[in-house]
């Protein structure tokens, strides 16, 4: 059973009852997943950016968008418009497929993994997770990468509070660390 189907059939009715909501449309849901990688060295080395774009496309199944510097910063040797990273916004079926792979395959492959931090909510029910290395995803082979780079994964939900967001992600299967 896919994650989307499981959400619709079992998780949503359970959350409706647990959160004490009156309407099925009030139940929090995952709106989008944003996968972001900042590459400061991409301004000097274009191969870094190309490798990162192909890795992100392999991991997410969607072409990555190049993020560019909004203004020049002399201390970082960056001019306006220089490429400084890449990002992918996932919605719909690809989003659920990515979340399923993240929860069931990627997170358990992290070294010394004891669960994700329950404190990374932003106050509005959205969750941000930092990944230190791209090797946790089974699509990336160790031989094909030049350097180990991390990425930020933001899960945007329709939840109105952190408690609702935490309840949603816990129901989806996120392994939160007990504090």
Swiss-Prot record:
Q: Reply yes or no: does the keyword Ribonucleoprotein apply.
A: yes
A cellular component term from Gene Ontology for this protein is: ribosome
Its keywords, alphabetically, are: Ribonucleoprotein, Ribosomal protein, RNA-binding, rRNA-binding, tRNA-binding
Q: Which GO terms describe its biological process?
A: translation
Show the GO MF annotations: rRNA binding; structural constituent of ribosome; tRNA binding
Q: Which domain of life is it from?
A: Bacteria
Cysteine disulfide links: none
Family per record:
Belongs to the universal ribosomal protein uL5 family.
Q: What does this protein do?
A: This is one of the proteins that bind and probably mediate the attachment of the 5S RNA into the large ribosomal subunit, where it forms part of the central protuberance. In the 70S ribosome it contacts protein S13 of the 30S subunit (bridge B1b), connecting the 2 subunits; this bridge is implicated in subunit movement. Contacts the P site tRNA; the 5S rRNA and some of its associated proteins might help stabilize positioning of ribosome-bound tRNAs.
Assembly notes: Part of the 50S ribosomal subunit; part of the 5S rRNA/L5/L18/L25 subcomplex. Contacts the 5S rRNA and the P site tRNA. Forms a bridge to the 30S subunit in the 70S ribosome.
Q: What is this protein called?
A: Large ribosomal subunit protein uL5
């Amino acid at each position: 059973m896919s994650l989307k189907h499981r959400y619709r059939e079992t998780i949503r009715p359970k959350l409706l009852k647990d959160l004490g909501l009156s309407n099925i449309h009030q139940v929090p849901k995952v709106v989008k997943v944003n996968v972001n990688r900042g590459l400061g060295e991409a301004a000097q080395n274009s191969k870094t950016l190309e490798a990162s774009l192909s890795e992100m496309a392999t991991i997410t199944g969607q072409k990555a968008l190049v993020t560019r510097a909004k203004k020049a910063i002399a201390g970082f040797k960056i001019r306006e418009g220089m490429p400084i990273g890449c990002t992918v916004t996932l919605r719909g079926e690809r989003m659920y497929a990515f979340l399923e792979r993240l929860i069931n395959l990627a997170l358990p492959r992290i070294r010394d993994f004891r669960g994700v931090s329950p404190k990374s909510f932003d106050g509005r029910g959205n969750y941000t997770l930092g990944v230190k290395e791209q090797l946790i995803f089974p699509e990336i082979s160790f031989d094909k990468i030049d350097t180990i780079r991390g990425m930020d994964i933001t899960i945007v939900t329709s939840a109105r509070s952190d408690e609702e967001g935490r309840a949603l992600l816990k129901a989806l299967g996120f392994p939160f660390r007990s504090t």
